[in-house]
Amino acid sequence: MKSYTSLLAVAILCLFGGVNGACTKNAIAQTGFNKDKYFNGDVWYVTDYLDLEPDDVPKRYCAALAAGTASGKLKEALYHYDPKTQDTFYDVSELQVESLGKYTANFKKVDKNGNVKVAVTAGNYYTFTVMYADDSSALIHTCLHKGNKDLGDLYAVLNRNKDAAAGDKVKSAVSAATLEFSKFISTKENNCAYDNDSLKSLLTK
């Protein structure tokens, strides 16, 4: 699903090419999910990811996110880096709580300083579910919607350490979701570059 993952990599907005894939209804949020630990303002790195149409997934993909609370609102800032072109992309979302561990993000594309490049567009949003999280790692499911149509499923393993390997607990969460970790694509060989200062500052924009 190249157009789906590429669309995420271009601030989750620009390269949609007509893909339609109903998202799973079986992404279950972690029981006892600790919102305060997950949304503490620190950076999560995407270390491994799985698109359910893997033949078209770009092999070189880097992403990170900061999730926190600003002015009483849950917010998420996403950063994407293309190691081939060295292009960087950012977007910022205010999150609507669907239930504990499940959120809808209405996003806007911004530059690193928070200046809006593409405003929030009705019908274009993503939903994500925190399927597992501890202090240092997480498994999330994301479904991107364009024109209120599902574009398909993307799973990502996150870590607070960009160089960390997935641990047994997060791998167990992958297995519990009836997924195979061996099918996830690692970002570790992608020569990823990150911009944590800008990413964290975008939570206040």
Curated annotation (Swiss-Prot):
Its main location: secreted. One of its GO terms (molecular function) is oxidoreductase activity. It catalyses: 3 nitrite + 2 H(+) = 2 nitric oxide + nitrate + H2O. Its EC number is 1.7.6.1. Keywords: Disulfide bond, Heme, Iron, Metal-binding, Oxidoreductase, Secreted, Signal, Vasoactive, Vasodilator. InterPro entries: Calycin, Nitrophorin, Nitrophorin_domain. It holds the Pfam family Nitrophorin. One of its GO terms (biological process) is vasodilation. GO terms for cellular component: extracellular region. Residues 1-21 form the signal peptide. Binds 1 heme b (iron(II)-protoporphyrin IX) group per subunit. Heme binds at H80. Salivary gland (at protein level). It is found in: Secreted. The keyword Nucleus does not apply. Belongs to the calycin superfamily. Nitrophorin family. Heme-based protein that delivers nitric oxide gas (NO) to the victim while feeding, resulting in vasodilation and inhibition of platelet aggregation. Reversibly binds nitric oxide (NO). Also binds tightly to histamine, which is released by the host to induce wound healing. NO release is pH dependent and linked to loop dynamics. This is Nitrophorin-4.
